[in-house]
């Protein structure tokens, strides 16, 4: 089952997105 991993990854990325949005792109 990879549902938990997917949810955790989504929250993790949403938390990093605003902080590393400029560096990511």
Curated annotation (Swiss-Prot):
<dbReference type="GO" id="GO:0004784">
    <property type="term" value="F:superoxide dismutase activity"/>
</dbReference>
<dbReference type="GO" id="GO:0046872">
    <property type="term" value="F:metal ion binding"/>
</dbReference>
<keyword id="KW-0049">Antioxidant</keyword>
<dbReference type="GO" id="GO:0005759">
    <property type="term" value="C:mitochondrial matrix"/>
</dbReference>
<comment type="function">
    <text>Destroys superoxide anion radicals which are normally produced within the cells and which are toxic to biological systems.</text>
</comment>
<comment type="similarity">
    <text>Belongs to the iron/manganese superoxide dismutase family.</text>
</comment>
<keyword id="KW-0560">Oxidoreductase</keyword>
<feature type="binding site">
    <location>
        <position position="9"/>
    </location>
    <ligand>
        <name>Mn(2+)</name>
    </ligand>
</feature>
<keyword id="KW-0020">Allergen</keyword>
<keyword id="KW-0464">Manganese</keyword>
<keyword id="KW-0479">Metal-binding</keyword>
<dbReference type="InterPro" id="IPR036324">
    <property type="entry name" value="Mn/Fe_SOD_N_sf"/>
</dbReference>
<comment type="subunit">
    <text>Homotetramer.</text>
</comment>
<keyword id="KW-0496">Mitochondrion</keyword>
<protein>
    <recommendedName>
        <fullName>Superoxide dismutase [Mn], mitochondrial</fullName>
        <ecNumber>1.15.1.1</ecNumber>
    </recommendedName>
</protein>
